[in-house]
A protein has these predicted regions:
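Outer-membrane beta-barrel initiation region
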Residues: 8-9, 24-29, 35-42
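Transmembrane beta-strand segments of Gram-negative outer membrane beta-barrel proteins
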Residues: 19, 44-51
Length: 228
């Protein structure tokens, strides 16, 4: 098990101790949330404001998250307490960089990690995940065997397959409640939900051909929707 004369992780029984290369690939994740809120008012008017910031560092290198949330709400009572107005605004912006692939083979660094021969030194491919190709005049992926569509150098995936996802969302709501008399009340409400998603991906040349062409690939996608 784990000798270097095979292309996958299974082989003859090893005679030398080996290190746990998987632990060297992962790191400790960290999530930090900072928030502040302010409220003020009297019997006629109330205001509320809050802001929250979330930052995250994933267990895989290059994975980052940044999120901002703003909430503002105001309620008021006018016309001798007969009309009540309530307005609410929520703003959110989130940026996620190099989000890991969930399951599957493509763009999943775990496939290469678990199939890597245990008798070889993974640190070499960490420090030399790309090598210069004189015929193409550029750096190309370096792996212990001819990389397949579903198995690539995990450090190539984290460094040379880059993505950025951005989401902006705005939620608005407004309600008005008018008391005509003791037995009749009229109410009107309105809502709007808008969001915009953007995706940017870069695949460097020599990434598996199932994902891109020989010279790499650039993906740009925009999506917007409004619901009322």
């Amino acid at each position: 098990y784990g000798v270097s004369d095979v292309v996958d992780s299974w082989g003859e029984k090893a005679y030398l101790p080996i290190s746990n290369e998987l632990n060297d690939f992962f790191r400790t994740g960290l999530t930090s949330i900072t928030s502040v809120s302010v409220s003020h008012g009297n019997e006629k008017l109330q205001n509320y404001f809050s802001y929250a910031n979330t930052t995250g560092k994933g267990i895989i290198d290059k994975n980052r998250l940044s999120k901002h949330n703003i909430t503002f709400r105001e309620t008021s009572v006018i016309f001798n307490n007969r009309l009540k107005l309530d307005g609410n605004v929520n703003l959110m912006r989130q940026v996620s960089k190099n989000k890991p692939t969930v399951g599957g083979f493509y763009m999943n660094p775990l496939v290469g990690l678990y199939r890597f021969p245990r008798g070889e030194d993974l640190s070499y491919y960490r420090n030399n995940f790309e090598v210069y190709d004189e015929s193409r005049n550029l750096n190309i992926q370096n792996w212990h065997t001819a990389y397949e569509d579903f198995e690539q150098n995990p450090y190539w995936i984290t460094n040379r397959i880059q993505s950025k996802e951005t989401r902006t969302r705005v939620i608005l709501s407004l309600s008005a409640n008018f008391k005509v008399n003791d037995w009749l009340t009229i109410q009107a409400r309105g809502n709007m939900d808008y969001w915009a998603d953007k995706l940017r991906q870069k695949f460097y040349a020599s990434t598996a051909t199932a994902l891109c062409g020989a010279n790499g690939r650039y993906v740009e996608m925009d999506y917007q929707e409004t619901q009322r």
